[in-house]
Amino acid sequence: MYHLISHSVYNDMTPFGGNPWSTMTDIGCDGIEMLTSFDSPPESHMPYTQSVHLPYATDWLAAWEERPYEMDDVRARYYMFGRTPEDVVCNITTAMDHAAAFSPAYGVMHLGNVDLHELRCRRYSLDDAKVVRTFCEIMNRVVADMPGGEPPFKVMFENLWWPGLRLVDESDFRILDRHIEFENWGICMDTGHLTVCLPRIYTQQDAIEALLDTCCGYSRDLIDRIGTVHFHYSASAAYRESFEDTPMGDMDMTDYIVSAYPHISGMDQHLPFTDAACAEILDVLRPTYVTHEMMGDDFIEKFMLQRSLLS
C-alpha cells in the first residue's frame, strides 16, 4: 500500500522544504497525488508526482445540455468545462493530455454534478442515475478519440455527496459499470465524501462505524475496482441538520458561489483520523494507494498524524 499526500500545481513545493524527497521519506510518504489544471504542468512538481487529480467542473451538465450560465470564459471552463458539449469534450481531453505528462499511476475524476443554483440546498433536482449515465457518455466520447480507445492512465472515478456516484450502496456503481465502454478505469473511494452522505455522523467514532458498515456491504467486484482511497472524514451531521437552506434566487451568481465556499467546507471537513480503528476501513477496501487528503497550511502535520496510525 502506497501512501500519498495531496498537493496542487497551483501551489509551489515550498512546504516540502529544500529536498522534497527527503521530507517525504522522513514522514512515510511515497509521493504526491497532484491536482492538475488545463495547462502544462510545472517541471518543479513532476519528479514527486505519483498520481493526478484532474480538474473538476461543478455543473458540467449545464454545458452538456446547452444551457450554460452567463459567465466569462475562464469561469465557464472551471464551472462547466466550457459552454457547449464540444467544449466539455475538448477541455476534459486537454486536462487529461496535460496530466499524462506526469506519467501517473492513475488520474482521479469527480463523478458528480450540482446545479449552481442549488449549492447551498439540502435537496438537489438531479438524480444520481442521470448524472452517472451522462458522465459515462462524456467520458466514452473523450476516450474514443484517444490511442487504442483507452485513456493514457487509469481513470479513477471519485464519489461525491452531490448527485452522481455516491457509493452509499452499489446502485450508482452498477450504472457506471454498465455504461463505461473502455477498460482502464477504477474507483477512488473518498471516505470523507461518503461520511457527508451518511446520517448521524457527529463524531470520529460515528464516522468509522458508518464507513465500516457501508464498506462491508460492498460486493467483491466493487472492492476490486477500488484502486485508491482518499482517506479523511467529516463529522458534519450537526451542521447538515442546522444550516439554512438557501437557493440562489435573485442573488448575483458570483456572490452566491463565493458564499457557498464556507458552506461546502462545513459539510466536507477533511479531518484527519486520530483513532487507530480507522485502519480497519483500509483492511476492508484493500486499495493499492491511499491519499491522505488534508487541507490547510498544516497539511503535512495532519498527514503525519494520520499516517502514524497505519502500518
PLM feature segments, named:
Residues Y2, V89-A95, A100-A105, F182-M189, ...:
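Histidine-acidic metal/acid-base catalytic patches
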Residues M1-T94:
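N-terminal pre-domain/capping segments
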Residues T23-D26, P42-Q50, S171-E181, R307-S311:
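Short, surface-exposed basic-aromatic patches at helix termini and helix-loop junctions that form
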Residues T36-F38, Y56-T58, L111-D115, N159-P163, ...:
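Active-site-proximal loop/turn and secondary-structure-junction residues that shape catalytic pockets
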Residues W60-E86, N113-D128, E244-M248, L305:
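Surface-exposed, active-site-proximal loop segments in enzymatic domains
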Residues D26, S44-P47, G148-E150, I180-E183, ...:
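Short, well-ordered coil/turn elements that cap or connect secondary structure elements
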Residues F81-G186:
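Active-site acidic/histidine proton-transfer and metal-coordination neighborhood
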Residues Y2-V9, D30-M34, P47-L54, G107-M109, ...:
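Hydrophobic faces of well-ordered beta-strands that scaffold small-molecule active sites
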